[in-house]
């Protein structure tokens, strides 16, 4: 009797195993978001540019260490910190270029911000949506990318300059200081064209035309060749 019982169990198991198709396991994960599945709706464009703004408030940007580095290497402040390496950086004593809080964290967070802007600028143009809203989204991403590259040049006088999304295997080449300034000017020119003068109450805090003009004015002040070019044109 036991032999019959075990035989039936074995036959049933074999039937189940041979009756299942391997394709049943090949299903899409509904929780996995990819570039192919995400950038489809106007709401995706808005959420994408919102993600660009989020890196304005990170430890490597204006939440903490960037303000620390700018203020304490200027005439506006000084450091009496017992943290020797941190104090050295505020006095332009760069003994360790891998010092995370003084250098690496800025590079890391700037380029994550740039990557997010590149995502928006690459994928939003193909979304079917109101053209005015689309251009405003693209203008915000352009402004923020210009802002990040502006910081790259202020701190390092050059850097890499990816302008579209790349995978993890991509190794960008260095761009010169002038190449970065030129790209900043290009992004700001687009931003000044399409950003609004102001936003409604629900969108306060987004970049405006005035913010782009202010950044463009700072660009001219920091870029000697651009200043000379404009002076010669005006003269």
Go through each PLM region and give its residues.
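Bacterial Sec-dependent N-terminal signal peptides
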Residues: 1-30
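Membrane-proximal, proline-rich intrinsically disordered regions
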Residues: 20-67
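TPR/TPR-like (Sel1-like) alpha-helical repeat modules
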Residues: 233-234
